Amino acid sequence: MLTLYTSGTTKAPKTVNHTWDDLNTAIDRSIREIGLTSNDTVLDVFPANTIAHYTITAMPAYRANATLVSAKFEANHYIKLFKEVQPTYIALIPRHWELLKEVDSWKTFNMSSVRYMVTGSGPVPQEMIDDFKSKGVQTVANWYGMTEQPPPVFIGYNSEEFDFEPKEGYAVDFLADGECIINGFATGDIFDVQSRKFLRRKDHSTGSTWKTI
């Protein structure tokens, strides 16, 4: 069993447990979606106490026998490391993008080696997606999911709008206020069902996490 201690919605750590069987299912789902093979190079900046590290980057890379490059995120170092390893698959969240934009070389940065990029962990602006596309990223996949319900539950391709057809193993409903319910689990995430966009958390996050670096 894997036990994760997260602190997103509140400052108090939240404990989430996953069996290895469930994690293996999520890892295999990610490998199929990304199309990961031994020819890929994965650049991973997700901390080890996040579900993303296990089901989006590190473990899928291991299972697919891909090359895994793991580093703590720092904007200048990320750009330097990217140039060195030329990854074919990356995963970044909106906060990473905000920090990368502060680097002078970002405006002309070439990311054409990337055939698939995952983003998510909160509302993703179309401006961010378009920025990465303009730098050569072939597919920017906006994955929705969470620690309790590992992503991807559903995906938006090159768009902040999601395809609400859930991936295998998930049943999704929406309450009248737009809150997403996954396999009976109340997520606390509010969507605009008409536009198919992730709007906000139901309760404002007060925790200090890797997402607020």
Model-assigned labels for residue ranges:
Residues M1-D28:
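Conserved AMP-binding A3 loop
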Residues T25-T41, N49-Y89:
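Conserved AMP-binding/adenylation subdomain of ANL enzymes
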Residues S159-D177, I181:
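Catalytic cores of nucleotide-enabled group-transfer and carboxylate-activating enzymes in metabolic
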Residues E179-I213:
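Conserved ATP-binding/catalytic segment of the ANL
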Residues Y89-L92, K101-E160:
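Gly/Ser/Thr-rich phosphate-binding loop
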Residues K14-N17, D44, N65-F73, A141:
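Short beta-strand->loop structural element characteristic of the AMP-binding/adenylate-forming
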Residues N17-T19, V153-Y157, L175:
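Short beta-strand-to-turn element immediately C-terminal to the catalytic PLP-Schiff-base lysine
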Residues D21, R95, G122-P123, A186:
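Alpha-helix/helix-capping structural signal
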